[in-house]
Design a protein with these regions (language model features):
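A short loop-to-beta-strand structural motif that recurs across blades of beta-propeller domains
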Residues: 3-5, 50-52, 93-95
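Beta-strand C-termini and the immediately following turn/loop, strongest in propeller blades
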Residues: 1, 7-8, 18, 37-45, ...
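Long, heptad-repeat coiled-coil alpha-helices that serve as cytosolic signaling/dimerization stalks
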Residues: 48-50, 169
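Multi-bladed beta-propeller domains
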Residues: 7-32, 41-44, 54-70, 99-124
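Serine-hydrolase catalytic core recognition
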Residues: 71-194
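Residue-level marker for the onset of beta-strands and adjacent loop->beta junctions
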Residues: 2-3, 50, 68, 126
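Short secondary-structure junction motifs
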Residues: 1-2, 46-48, 91, 151-153
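Repeat-solenoid scaffold signature
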Residues: 49, 57-84
């Protein structure tokens, strides 16, 4: 797993900052005033990412309040950050937060998009997990036509991209060609590789 390690300027390991069965997806910065590291990880689920703060003693605080895929851009003094999140049911929302996670202002809500989409039947992704023959758990999503009937046969498209550092199965909002194909009567399936 990718984790944060704290080194001296001379290259000597001081301590491992994070540990566990999850990955640190991005290091966001260090605040010398409160001796804290800020980062994004998938601690709650491999499908979700949240913003965290951890001090030098290991006290960790989750700063993101919304489930789904969160990303952050901190100010140069590490006192404020822009949080961008979405999930399967929520188009991108952007907030201005202080470094404790408190939302100071909501900058983008996408309310007009939500209102427009409420007038249409849009296929939705459904997550699933399965184990391979050798016991490895893989995550996937399936998108069925809106008027899906279990008694009918449908053509199936399997979307697969296993490029380096890629992950396609995430709790994030999108409308893409897969949505279009499901709206045209296809079942679309995606599974992340190992």
């Amino acid at each position: 797993y990718n984790h944060l390690y704290w080194y001296s300027m001379g290259g000597n390991l001081i301590k491992q900052v994070t540990s566990g069965n999850y990955e640190v997806k991005e290091f966001l910065g260090w605040d010398a005033d409160d001796n804290s590291f800020y980062y994004i990880s998938n601690e709650e689920s491999p499908l979700r990412q949240a913003v965290y703060q951890i001090d030098r003693k290991g006290k960790k605080t989750k700063l993101s309040s919304q489930p789904g895929l969160n990303s952050a851009q901190f100010s140069t003094n590490m006192k404020y950050y822009m949080n961008r999140y979405s999930n399967l049911n929520t188009p991108t929302v952007i907030t201005l937060n202080d470094n404790t996670g408190k939302v100071l202002s909501t900058l983008v809500t996408n309310d007009n998009l939500k209102q427009t989409l409420s007038k249409y039947s849009v296929p939705q992704k459904e997550f699933f997990t399965f184990k391979t023959e050798d016991g490895v758990s893989l995550n996937g999503w399936m998108m069925k036509p809106v008027n899906f009937s279990a008694s009918k046969k449908y053509p199936v498209l399997l979307y697969q991209y296993s490029g380096p550092g890629s992950q396609q199965v995430l709790d994030t909002w999108s409308i893409s060609w897969e949505t279009y194909m499901a709206s045209r009567g296809f079942i679309v399936v995606c599974v992340d590789g190992r």
